[in-house]
């Protein structure tokens, strides 16, 4: 009790510190906390710009030659906002609550040919900008490009020098914000000589209107003003197809496989009764199928420490994914709360480290593992080390290109502190509890000292094609978290059913090496997810450039690895439960 008392007390004091470190207090904002009086100033923050087709390639708005105050004042950001690439700063726009502005000059500029070329390149790459008004994002394109494929060929590039802001209010709160360039002619950037300066006058207007919508939760109006496409709607046909697939698989396992098992059990138990005069070994030599390997099926696998680490981290990500979806269902994530899902993911990852330590150490001790300290180190490194290596490469590329996605040094130190002071200690604490609470592995059958020779196995491949490619790399705003939770449950159910079926076929072939194969069979879905991401990049997206490419493939590989851990864990424990069931019901001497 003395050993466990100190970590438990330490963790209780550390949890509030973790919440403060992550900025939960000022990360997710409570809707409607800002109340205005007529004439009160409304601050407009400029945030970031970037290519429309490269969602993760963003730069600070003031990196472009635009109207900029003499002294840039940055807004204090939460951890989630920093991770999301936000770098908000005050602007020259003067907006007052419920006061319309017909046309006001923002600034006068004289651009050199190099600055004009920078704007031309940004417009050709379809750069968009993002402003923030009262925690509402406002997005629009930097300029306008017109290209004709007919003869004579034309290529015109123009810069939007006038922005029309439209804001809706209800009572003393801002409900909706948008920007448009309708009825505005872009300023041409063509035909400028290398030694010539381009004079520009940036202007803006503000229109206020009252709305009957009382809350920003009406996402049909408040999400993003329709700037990003909203193509992710409920595809009922896909949902029905998934349901039919699940019902077929469950029916296969529950009806067909159970009927086969009953026949096998009846035959094996009848043979056992009729052969009572001979020894068990003589009886085994005259039989075949999964019964004959009952003395080897619970033989512990090689690399048991690595197997337990995979199961522990997989269980952690199952809890993490479920927690994120449940929090989304509770309405904790929406477009107004910048980076809330990032902060929540870090918080949940740190807190669920105890799950990985407990599951890994508990099962490791059950199957006879003695080096539990090494098992804990392996468990805590199984995901964190690949993640750190991937992040280092991606962050270095962002830093070299001046992207806002590159994390500041202070944020890096904060995340490292969270892992060292919370994640790793909770893994150790969970490991201690798991080790101390572990009971001996209760195998229904005894295991021989000499392993049985495995006959030649037939070769087959089973691929479960399940499509749930997240919209992280696109521009859609996905809000159907109820459907996502349902589909997540379908994915786990399908993985469990396939694992049980493949394990039965493997045991029927007298191959008792099911431990690792049960993890790899369904866990290989992670490889498919990565291969699909390659197909998506090449055929379904318009991404380009080193920054976006490195980020896409780096985190796609990491995503496939996480799915391997989660589905491999579900697959293993489903197979273990199934094997216990069939051998418990088998009569043996």
Swiss-Prot record:
<comment type="similarity">
    <text>Belongs to the nonaspanin (TM9SF) (TC 9.A.2) family.</text>
</comment>
<dbReference type="GO" id="GO:0006914">
    <property type="term" value="P:autophagy"/>
</dbReference>
<dbReference type="GO" id="GO:0016020">
    <property type="term" value="C:membrane"/>
</dbReference>
<feature type="transmembrane region" description="Helical">
    <location>
        <begin position="552"/>
        <end position="572"/>
    </location>
</feature>
<keyword id="KW-0732">Signal</keyword>
<keyword id="KW-0968">Cytoplasmic vesicle</keyword>
<feature type="transmembrane region" description="Helical">
    <location>
        <begin position="482"/>
        <end position="502"/>
    </location>
</feature>
<feature type="signal peptide">
    <location>
        <begin position="1"/>
        <end position="27"/>
    </location>
</feature>
<dbReference type="InterPro" id="IPR004240">
    <property type="entry name" value="EMP70"/>
</dbReference>
<feature type="transmembrane region" description="Helical">
    <location>
        <begin position="237"/>
        <end position="257"/>
    </location>
</feature>
<dbReference type="GO" id="GO:0031410">
    <property type="term" value="C:cytoplasmic vesicle"/>
</dbReference>
<keyword id="KW-0325">Glycoprotein</keyword>
<feature type="transmembrane region" description="Helical">
    <location>
        <begin position="373"/>
        <end position="393"/>
    </location>
</feature>
<feature type="glycosylation site" description="N-linked (GlcNAc...) asparagine">
    <location>
        <position position="401"/>
    </location>
</feature>
<dbReference type="GO" id="GO:0072657">
    <property type="term" value="P:protein localization to membrane"/>
</dbReference>
<feature type="transmembrane region" description="Helical">
    <location>
        <begin position="339"/>
        <end position="359"/>
    </location>
</feature>
<feature type="transmembrane region" description="Helical">
    <location>
        <begin position="310"/>
        <end position="330"/>
    </location>
</feature>
<dbReference type="Pfam" id="PF02990">
    <property type="entry name" value="EMP70"/>
</dbReference>
<feature type="transmembrane region" description="Helical">
    <location>
        <begin position="412"/>
        <end position="432"/>
    </location>
</feature>
<feature type="glycosylation site" description="N-linked (GlcNAc...) asparagine">
    <location>
        <position position="542"/>
    </location>
</feature>
<feature type="transmembrane region" description="Helical">
    <location>
        <begin position="518"/>
        <end position="538"/>
    </location>
</feature>
<protein>
    <recommendedName>
        <fullName>Transmembrane 9 superfamily member 1</fullName>
    </recommendedName>
</protein>
<keyword id="KW-1133">Transmembrane helix</keyword>
<comment type="function">
    <text>Plays an essential role in autophagy.</text>
</comment>
<keyword id="KW-0472">Membrane</keyword>
<feature type="glycosylation site" description="N-linked (GlcNAc...) asparagine">
    <location>
        <position position="178"/>
    </location>
</feature>
<dbReference type="GO" id="GO:0000421">
    <property type="term" value="C:autophagosome membrane"/>
</dbReference>
<keyword id="KW-0072">Autophagy</keyword>
<keyword id="KW-0812">Transmembrane</keyword>
<keyword id="KW-0458">Lysosome</keyword>
<dbReference type="GO" id="GO:0005765">
    <property type="term" value="C:lysosomal membrane"/>
</dbReference>
């Amino acid at each position: 009790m003395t050993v466990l008392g100190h970590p438990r007390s330490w963790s209780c004091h550390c949890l509030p510190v973790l919440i403060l470190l992550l900025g939960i207090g000022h990360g997710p904002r409570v809707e409607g906390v800002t109340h205005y009086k007529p004439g009160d100033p409304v601050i407009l923050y400029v945030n970031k710009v970037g290519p429309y087709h490269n969602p993760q390639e963003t730069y600070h708005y003031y990196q472009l030659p635009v109207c900029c105050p003499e002294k840039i004042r940055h807004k204090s950001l939460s951890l989630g906002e920093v991770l999301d690439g936000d770098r908000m700063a005050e602007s020259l726009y003067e907006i007052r609550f419920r006061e319309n502005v017909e046309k006001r000059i923002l600034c006068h500029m004289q651009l050199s040919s190099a600055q004009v070329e920078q704007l031309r390149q940004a417009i050709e790459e379809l750069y968009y900008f993002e402003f923030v008004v009262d925690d509402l994002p406002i997005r629009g394109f930097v300029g306008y490009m017109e290209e004709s494929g007919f003869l004579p060929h034309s290529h015109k590039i123009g810069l939007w020098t006038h922005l029309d802001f439209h804001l809706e209010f209800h009572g003393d709160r801002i409900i909706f914000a948008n920007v448009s360039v309708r009825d505005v002619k872009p300023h041409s950037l063509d035909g400028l000589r290398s030694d010539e300066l381009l004079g520009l006058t940036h202007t803006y207007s503000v229109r206020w209107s009252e709305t009957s919508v009382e809350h920003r939760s009406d996402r049909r109006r408040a999400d993003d003003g329709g700037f990003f496409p909203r193509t992710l709607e409920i595809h009922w046909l896909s949902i029905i197809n998934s349901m039919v697939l699940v019902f077929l698989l469950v029916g296969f396992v529950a009806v067909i496989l159970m009927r086969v098992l009953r026949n096998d059990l009846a035959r094996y138990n009848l043979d056992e009764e009729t052969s009572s005069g001979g020894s068990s070994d003589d009886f085994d030599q005259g039989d075949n199928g999964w019964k004959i390997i009952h003395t080897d099926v619970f033989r512990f696998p090689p690399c048991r420490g690595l197997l337990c680490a995979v199961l522990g981290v997989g269980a952690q990500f199952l809890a993490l994914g479920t927690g994120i979806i449940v929090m989304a269902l509770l309405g904790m994530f929406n477009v107004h709360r910048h980076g809330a899902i990032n902060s929540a993911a870090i918080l949940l990852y740190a807190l669920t480290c105890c799950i990985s330590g407990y599951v890994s150490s508990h099962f490791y001790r059950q199957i006879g593992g003695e080096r539990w300290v090494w098992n804990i180190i392996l468990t805590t490194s199984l995901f964190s080390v690949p993640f750190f290596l991937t992040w280092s490469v991606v962050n270095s590329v962002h830093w070299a290109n001046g992207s806002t996605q590159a994390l500041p040094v202070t944020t890096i130190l904060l995340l490292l502190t969270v892992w060292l002071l919370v994640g790793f200690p909770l893994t150790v604490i969970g490991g201690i509890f798991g080790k101390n609470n572990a009971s001996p592995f209760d195998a229904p059958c005894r295991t021989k000292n000499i392993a049985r020779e495995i006959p030649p196995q037939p070769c087959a491949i089973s691929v479960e094609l399940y499509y749930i490619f997240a919209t992280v790399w696109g521009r859609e705003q996905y809000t159907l978290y109820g459907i996502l939770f349902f589909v997540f449950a379908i994915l786990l159910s399908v993985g469990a059913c396939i694992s049980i079926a493949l394990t039965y076929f493997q045991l029927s072939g007298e191959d008792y090496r099911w431990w690792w194969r049960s993890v790899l069979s369904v866990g290989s879905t992670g490889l498919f997810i990565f291969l699909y991401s390659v197909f998506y990049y090449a055929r379904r997206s318009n991404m380009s450039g080193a920054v976006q490419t490195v980020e896409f493939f780096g985190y796609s590989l990491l995503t496939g690895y996480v799915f391997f851990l989660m589905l491999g864990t579900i697959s293993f424990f489903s197979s273990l439960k199934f094997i216990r069931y069939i051998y418990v019901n088998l009569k043996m001497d």
